[in-house]
Regions:
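N-terminal Rossmann-like FAD-binding beta1-loop-alpha1 element of flavoenzymes
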Residues: 15-55
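N-terminal FAD cofactor-binding segment of flavoenzymes
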Residues: 32, 50-112
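Short beta-strand to alpha-helix junction loop
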Residues: 75-79, 124-143, 200
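Predominantly flavin-linked oxidoreductase catalytic cores and closely associated redox partners
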Residues: 147-287
């Protein structure tokens, strides 16, 4: 439950709600709202419905379902334990559907070698997750959504703009619905933008004379080279390290999937031209072979080539405080909110987008419970302001921590490419605030970065710290919470301070370049 919002404030009231986008976040948001009694219509521009998993099977979803509006639809994905935890509490039928489609239930701590983690303990179940390839996962979520009363999904409906009341002096523009291709007007008490990282909400608002939302935007700076595999034995490879591992010039992701499939991703800086050779499957495989903790994940049948993704942005959008300095902190519009990636998005290599999106969706559901339908229609500004307050307090710190880590990792990769060896060690994944992009403040000036590196290094030597590091990585706690526990900061720094820049075994940059002939 979110700050200031409790079950005792909820009362069953009904609003007409339009959710834009039938991806993971859109359908999850729609189900949460429909189960509270709201009448929810989801508009999705892609026309094709997912194949029924029970009838067609997961391979049909993987091979035949086209989602042209989702650029990363067949790229590697994983669901974190934070997502599983929320789904188990809020929408457990989704987990059942994923499991029924062949998605495994895994304990990410138990997958580590026993010397790293020790015997499993009470409480280690928090590291469990349920995951699948993105098309299979979306098909499972869609199957559950079809069974939710009060929820209708309309596919093949392209939204082109917003419906709004005539401008009124001193009041924010009141959104009343959307316009669809062909001029169809669809009205609602509330429009929820779940269009993802490519959301055109800012342009739609500008087109009706409203201020654009205040935005922070910059190139994410990473490029991803991913490949899917299928097991020859039906078993997943053994894990020798955490899913995300950092090395000189690259990071490596090893992600379990459904039905004996998995994926591996090599992530580099987009400016690192010499590593663009990783687009070639033979060179990609030659690189992977040089990392002994990852090599077992090569032992499968490749079911894709090397899929590359680049050009992503880190972006944060706020509907309270637009880009008009005269308007100050007034809402840019009422009757519309943005959830998940449509609100803020960042580097996907940490796998946090679905979890943050579900936290955000639950926040919207709780705010609507608090203010009731009278607040939605009678005091729309209250809804926008309250949702902004809750987002800033409970969701934005997750985004800021991820952005901080991205900036630090980019600085490391820039140092690797320059050959100066600066920037700290491998690992990390927690904290908050801002660090520098390439050309910004050095990592040596940020003690939080050194603490994050020490946390990872200490996790290799201490079973308690291994749990703390994994909990931070999986969004189950924060680095600040870890370091305020009695004796933990001293323990981490004793074991991890001064560790090698990259403590996991693997090639240095020159050895990597030689392996791929770059």
């Amino acid at each position: 439950m979110l700050p200031g919002i409790g079950d005792d404030t909820w009362r069953c009231t009904v609003a007409e709600i339009l959710v834009l986008g039938a991806g993971l976040n859109g359908l999850s948001t729609a189900m949460l709202l429909a189960r509270d009694g709201h009448q929810v219509t989801v508009l999705e521009r892609d026309p094709a419905a997912p194949p029924g998993l029970a009838e067609a099977g997961p391979e049909q979803a993987w091979e035949a379902w086209e989602r042209r509006g989702v650029s990363q639809f067949r790229l590697p994905h994983v669901m974190l334990p934070r997502w599983r935890e929320l789904m188990e509490r809020e929408l457990p039928e989704v987990l059942g559907e994923v499991l029924g489609a062949g998605g495994p239930r895994l304990n990410l701590l138990a997958m580590l070698p026993e010397p790293r983690r020790g015997p499993l303990r009470a409480g280690d179940e928090r590291f469990e997750t349920v995951t699948a390839r993105r098309p299979v996962l979306e098909a499972a979520v869609a199957a559950v959504a079809e069974r939710v009363p009060g929820l209708v999904v309309r596919r093949g409906v392209a939204v082109t703009g917003l419906l709004a009341d005539p401008p009124a002096p001193g009041r924010a523009t009141r959104i009343r619905g959307v316009l669809a291709a062909g001029g169809q007007a669809l009205r609602a008490d509330l429009v929820v933008d779940c269009c993802g990282r490519r959301s055109p909400l800012g342009s739609w608002l500008a087109a009706i004379g409203a201020p654009r939302p205040a935005e922070e935007r910059e190139d994410c700076g990473f490029v991803y080279y991913g490949r899917h595999f299928r097991s020859r034995t039906g078993e997943l490879p053994r894990a020798e390290a955490n899913m995300l591992q950092h090395y000189d010039s690259v990071s490596v992701l090893t992600l379990p999937g459904d039905n004996g499939t998995w994926s591996v991703v090599l992530t580099t800086a987009s400016r690192d031209r010499r590593l663009r050779a990783l687009r070639d499957p033979d060179r990609w495989d030659a690189a992977l072979a040089r990392y002994p903790l990852v090599a077992p994940w090569r032992d499968g049948e490749p079911i894709t080539g090397v899929d590359a993704m680049a050009g992503l942005e880190d972006r944060h959008r706020r509907l309270v405080a637009g880009d008009d300095p005269v308007a100050g902190d007034d809402p840019v519009a009422t009757g519309v909110v943005a959830v998940g990636d449509a609100w803020a998005c960042t580097n996907p290599s940490l796998g946090r987008g679905a979890s943050i999106g579900l936290v955000h969706a639950c926040a919207l559901r709780d705010v609507l419970r608090e203010i009731g339908a009278g607040g939605i229609s009678g005091d729309p500004e209250k809804l926008v302001r309250r949702f902004d307050e809750v987002t800033v307090a409970a969701v934005e710190p997750l985004y800021r921590a991820t952005l901080w880590f991205d900036r630090g990792r980019l600085a490391e990769l820039a140092a690797d490419a320059a050959g100066d060896g600066g920037g700290g060690g491998g690992g990390g994944g927690g904290g908050g605030g801002d660090g520098g992009r390439e050309g910004g403040p050095g990592l040596a000036e940020d003690p939080r970065w050194a603490a994050g590196k020490a946390l990872f290094a200490a996790s290799l030597a201490d079973q308690d710290v291994a749990r703390e590091y994994l909990a931070v990585s999986m969004l189950l706690t924060t680095a600040d919470e870890v370091f305020t526990r009695p004796g933990m900061a001293e323990r981490v720094m004793r074991l991890g301070a001064g560790a090698a820049r990259y403590p996991l075994p693997g090639p240095d940059r020159q050895e990597l370049l030689a392996a791929i002939g770059a």
